[in-house]
């Protein structure tokens, strides 16, 4: 069936105040509303202008077709569920302006349908209509507002508005439409077979004979639509007909009323079908009478022309039959013998763990042998409740009990067979066989061996819809959730348990318990072996894993021995019959011998026995709720602590990785800087003819530096103007290749010669001590321990023009004048062995050194200072009493010179560790050394203090500094007054005691250097760094600045640069720089 929402076209006549409301409430428009929907419809169709003035204009009336945009998509279901009905209103011309403002009120009809079951009511048959008009009614697959293109009908105002006493026949004759009627019918539920626009509806279906069965008590939310044959005229109601109108879904509506005869529903039983049919006919008769009376009254009142008609508000409330109270839906579980509250609970009852647990426990109890020595040796079984009683009295009490009576009442209501109340007496030895033979089909013992099938679609429908009461949907016995029990080895008599079907009305519970359903369930299991194979292991697993009842625990834990038999007393009546048992330890009573055995094995009795009788009895520990909560809290805190430490470790690991990454990036950038400047220095035609080699010179030592690449320099950020000036100045002050090779040559020759001198002196000492040849070790007989580089040679701070380098010769004993002279005598001989060149050697006793000069250009000078670590050790032990007992040699060298040589060793080691790896540090120190040599003011600045200051200024920066930024930062530090007196000063990090490296400077020297640094900082701020560095300004590399300069000032013809011209105009004297 295709859901169709009819669009009714009517003529709006505003001559009487409240007439349209009367027509709406009088069921004129073809709607049968219920409840709030009727009130809403009446209020909606009754909106009128404030004054009820009759319009009498003989002009042509404009016809408007107003459509309501759909609020939500219409759901296509098996039943008719129109979501909105649009009304085409034809109004006179003067009312057209007011219609635009109230289009929302007249445009649509809101509905609140919650169900999809709509019955078809009957309406009185109207008078035979005239032949259908020439225009064809089209279906359009659209929801938009479209005006009708057909011309409107011109009505005579006098004929309609000025004849209040006209008869019904005259009115009917005048109301006949013209051939071109502005009627357009819309289909609100589009389907695939429709064509767009104004095409014909070509998908026609064969008229089906359907007789709808109305439920006995429909849902309160159900709204019934009355669908009538479509007619283009409005005529008085004729005699009522008792047929249901029919329509064929073709290009046009058929105006002939044809009776529907519905297709047969084989799923319903005859009794239910007949009852529903009779009830439906009664309801149809009542509704036909009420609808006929209401329609006749409304139609007569609409055309009588009276100004006021007395009406009863909301007449269609009388058409709604009073609903009986809805009985609750019953869901009965054949296994547990209980009724469930709803379909979801019923499904959970069948397939939840409690079902399997009940089944497994019952099987264990039935299969486990019970001691035959008990007084009661027989069991009385109740077939209806599946309950076993230990005696006749207990069975009689069960029969009289509320549980049994409730089950009997439920079975009576369901129409299920009720077995006899005679007990089924079974001996305990054969209880397992007797129980399984006498139980119904759905007993728990047979459930364990049965196959449980579950229809997924039916479960989903039940859980989502909650078994909603729909007229055309029902859950069959095969599709509904059920437990079909098929025992495999059961030879006893089998009583078939009736199954349950839920009929669509929601209140009819049909019982179709027969053997055909059992056979159908069996066939379903056979046809679906996968479902049975899946379900059987799950039932068994739950049954084994979750035995929770005390009976199952007592049956499974057979190794627990009962204790305290003597403390259980038998209580007898006057006749001497045992009526109950009393436990003195637990202060409890019970009347079952089996309960006595279970009580003696129980944990409570054993705990009381351990507490009062035998403390050594072992009882299993079962933590209480409080102890369990405490344990869970401890575990939770422990897990939180572990999580906390795990996160801490991850954070530490992340920080280490970030730190390692930053260090790698820093060293990589520094190496790129070094490679860049080395490549620029080696470029023959580059901008920097002799670029610097990086932080270290050729003679410097830096462990771990990779070899220089032969390819092009890596990409780096563009240099600033200050960087270009600093690097250009550094290239000019850096030593040439000849100077570096000369220094390297004379230093290496001197070191090799001193090694030979040490060997010669050691051989001479061995010849004097003949007895100690085998006793003395090789290291102790040497007077000279080694030679080390210090000063600018070790630090890599050589400048162009430097001819002096320093070496330190370590001695095993305190250096003396005799040792100095012997070294000076042997050194020329060893130099002649190593190099053919001639060297001039001088012995400077006052300096505690040997001075070696080369005779070949470039002439280099090497100062070799003798020292020993013993001198500093003795200086540190000045407070010791034994230090004065050791007498120094009479010809020992100057102690201060030796201490200065040891300090130079420490300074070189510190510089290699701290300053060599710092970006731009070595470059800036070379720049400042050149400044100290050029400017007399800076010549008093100690070199060691300057190195400490530069290292601290650059290392304290937040990021690596470029050469220009580093030079500016050093000048800023000095300008702040850090070297002035009264400040902490610069402490020597190589001394154990606090020592200020600026102690040798006077106050005037400190102030002069500070003032000069401030003046240099001002020059840097005004782009006069070339004056600070003592160099000529560089040509501009960016053409944009040259254009700017040309605009500001015309360049001179002689090519003088703008910076030089500005320098000439400056009145300050920069000779100090």
From Swiss-Prot:
Residue numbers spanned by region Disordered: 120-139, 419-443, 701-722, 759-781, 1039-1073
Record keyword DNA-binding present: yes
N6-acetyllysine modifications at: 508, 515
Phosphoserine: residues carrying this PTM: 1053
Linked residues for Glycyl lysine isopeptide (Lys-Gly) (interchain with G-Cter in SUMO2): 508, 540, 622
Record keywords, A-Z: Acetylation, Chromosome, Cytoplasm, Developmental protein, DNA-binding, Isopeptide bond, Nucleus, Phosphoprotein, Repeat, RNA-binding, Ubl conjugation
InterPro entries: DZF_dom, DZF_dom_C, DZF_dom_N, Matrin/U1-like-C_Znf_C2H2, NT_sf, Znf_C2H2_sf, Znf_C2H2_type
Subcellular location: Nucleus; Cytoplasm; Cytoplasmic granule; Chromosome
Tissue distribution of the protein: Expressed in hippocampus.
Residue spans of biased composition, Basic and acidic residues class: 761-781, 1061-1073
Membrane-spanning intervals of the chain: none
PANTHER family according to UniProt: ZINC FINGER RNA-BINDING PROTEIN
Task of the protein: Involved in postimplantation and gastrulation stages of development. Binds to DNA and RNA. Involved in the nucleocytoplasmic shuttling of STAU2.
The name this protein goes by in its record: Zinc finger RNA-binding protein
Naturally occurring in which organism (per UniProt): Rattus norvegicus (Rat)
């Amino acid at each position: 069936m295709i859901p169709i929402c009819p669009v009714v076209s009517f003529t709006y006549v505003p001559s009487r105040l409240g007439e349209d409301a009367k027509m709406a409430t009088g069921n004129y428009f073809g709607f049968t509303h219920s409840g709030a929907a009727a009130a809403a419809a009446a209020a909606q169709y009754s909106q009128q202008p404030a004054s009820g003035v009759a319009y009498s204009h003989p002009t042509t009336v404009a016809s408007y077709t107003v459509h309501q945009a759909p609020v939500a998509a219409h759901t296509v279901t098996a039943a008719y569920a129109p979501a909105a009905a649009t009304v085409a209103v034809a109004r006179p011309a003067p009312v057209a302006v007011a219609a635009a403002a109230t289009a929302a009120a007249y445009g649509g009809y809101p509905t609140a349908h919650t169900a999809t079951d709509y019955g078809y009511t009957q309406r009185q048959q109207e008078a035979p209509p005239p032949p259908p008009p020439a225009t064809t009614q089209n279906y359009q697959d659209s929801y938009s507002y479209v005006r009708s293109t057909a011309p409107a009908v011109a009505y005579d105002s006098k004929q309609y508005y000025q004849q209040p006493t006209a008869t019904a026949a005259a009115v009917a004759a005048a109301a006949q439409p013209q051939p071109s009627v502005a009627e357009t019918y819309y289909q609100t539920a589009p389907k695939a077979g429709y064509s767009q626009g104004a095409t014909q509806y070509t998908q026609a279906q064969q008229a089906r004979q359907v007789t709808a069965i109305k439920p006995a008590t429909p849902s309160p939310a159900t709204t019934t639509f009355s669908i009538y044959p479509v007619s283009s005229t409005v005529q008085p109601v004729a005699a009522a007909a008792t047929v249901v109108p029919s329509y064929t879904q073709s290009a046009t509506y058929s105006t002939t009323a044809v009776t529907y005869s519905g297709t047969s529903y084989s799923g319903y039983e005859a009794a239910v079908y007949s009852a529903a049919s009779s009830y439906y006919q009664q309801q149809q008769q009542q509704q036909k009478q009420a609808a006929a009376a209401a329609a006749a009254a409304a139609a007569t009142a609409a055309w009588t022309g009276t100004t006021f008609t007395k009406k009863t508000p909301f007449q269609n409330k009388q058409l709604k039959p009073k609903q009986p109270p809805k009985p609750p839906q019953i869901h009965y579980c054949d296994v547990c013998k209980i009724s469930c509250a709803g379909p979801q609970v019923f499904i959970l009852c069948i397939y939840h763990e409690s079902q399997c647990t009940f089944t497994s426990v019952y099987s264990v109890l039935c299969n486990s042998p019970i001691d035959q020595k008990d007084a009661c040796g027989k069991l009385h079984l109740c077939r209806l409740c599946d309950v076993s009683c230990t005696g006749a009295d207990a069975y009689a009490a069960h029969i009289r009990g509320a549980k049994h009576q409730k089950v009997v009442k439920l079975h009576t209501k369901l129409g299920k067979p009720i077995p006899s109340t005679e007990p089924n007496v079974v001996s305990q030895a054969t209880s397992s066989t007797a129980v399984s033979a006498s139980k119904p089909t759905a007993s728990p013992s047979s459930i364990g061996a049965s196959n449980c099938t579950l229809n997924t679609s039916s479960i989903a429908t039940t859980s989502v819809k909650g078994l909603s009461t729909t007229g055309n949907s029902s859950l069959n016995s095969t599709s509904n959730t059920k437990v079909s029990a098929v025992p495999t080895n059961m030879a006893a008599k089998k009583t078939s348990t009736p199954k349950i079907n839920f009929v669509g009305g929601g209140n009819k519970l049909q019982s179709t318990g027969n053997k055909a359903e059992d056979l159908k369930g069996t066939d379903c299991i056979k046809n679906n072996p996968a479902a049975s194979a899946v379900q059987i292991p799950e039932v068994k697993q739950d049954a084994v894993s979750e035995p929770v009842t005390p009976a199952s625990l007592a049956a499974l834990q057979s190794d627990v021995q009962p204790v305290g038999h003597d403390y259980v007393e038998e209580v007898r009546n006057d006749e001497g019959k045992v009526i109950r048992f009393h436990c003195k330890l637990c202060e409890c009573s019970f009347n079952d011998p089996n309960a006595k055995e279970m009580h003696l094995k129980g944990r409570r009795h054993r705990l009381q026995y351990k507490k009062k009788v035998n403390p050594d009895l072992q009882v299993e520990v079962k933590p209480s709720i409080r102890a369990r909560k405490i344990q869970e809290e401890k575990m939770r805190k422990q897990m939180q602590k572990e999580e906390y430490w795990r996160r801490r470790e991850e954070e530490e690991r992340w920080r280490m990785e970030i730190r390692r990454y930053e260090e790698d990036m820093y060293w990589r950038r520094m190496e790129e800087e070094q490679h860049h400047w080395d490549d620029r220095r080696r470029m023959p035609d580059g901008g920097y003819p002799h670029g610097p080699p990086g932080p270290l010179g050729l003679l410097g030592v830096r462990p771990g530096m990779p070899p220089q690449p032969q390819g092009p320099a890596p990409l780096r950020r563009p240099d600033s103007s200050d960087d270009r000036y600093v690097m250009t100045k550094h290239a000019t002050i850096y030593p040439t290749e000849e100077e570096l090779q000369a220094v390297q040559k004379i230093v290496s020759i001197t070191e090799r010669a001193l090694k030979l001198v040490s060997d010669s002196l050691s051989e001479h000492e061995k010849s004097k001590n003949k007895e100690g040849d085998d006793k003395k070790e090789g290291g102790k007989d040497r007077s000279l321990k080694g030679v080390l580089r210090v000063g600018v040679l070790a630090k890599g701070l050589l400048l162009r023009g430097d001819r002096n380098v320093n070496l330190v010769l370590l001695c095993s004993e305190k250096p003396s004048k005799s040792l100095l002279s012997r070294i000076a005598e042997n050194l020329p001989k060893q130099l002649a062995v190593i190099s053919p060149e001639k060297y001039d050697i001088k012995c400077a006793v006052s300096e505690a050194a040997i001075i070696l000069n080369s005779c070949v250009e470039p002439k280099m000078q090497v100062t070799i200072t003798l020292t020993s670590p013993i001198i500093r050790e003795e200086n540190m032990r000045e407070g010791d009493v034994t230090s004065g007992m050791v007498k120094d040699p009479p010809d020992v060298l100057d102690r201060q010179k030796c201490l200065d040589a040891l300090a130079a060793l420490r300074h070189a080691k510190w510089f290699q560790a701290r300053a060599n790896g710092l970006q731009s540090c070595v470059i800036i120190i070379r720049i400042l050394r050149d400044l100290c040599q050029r400017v007399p003011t800076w010549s008093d600045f100690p070199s060691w203090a300057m190195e400490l200051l530069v290292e601290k200024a650059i290392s304290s920066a937040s990021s690596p500094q470029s050469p220009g930024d580093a030079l500016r930062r050093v000048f800023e530090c000095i300008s702040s007054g850090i070297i002035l007196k009264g400040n902490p000063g610069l402490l020597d990090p190589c001394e154990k005691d606090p020592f200020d490296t600026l102690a040798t400077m006077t106050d005037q020297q400190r102030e002069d250097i500070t003032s000069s640094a401030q003046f240099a900082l001002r020059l840097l701020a005004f782009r006069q760094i070339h004056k600070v560095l003592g160099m000529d300004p560089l040509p501009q590399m960016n053409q944009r600045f040259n254009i700017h300069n040309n605009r500001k000032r015309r360049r001179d013809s002689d090519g003088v640069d703008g910076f030089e011209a500005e320098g000439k105009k400056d009145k300050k004297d920069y000779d100090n720089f």
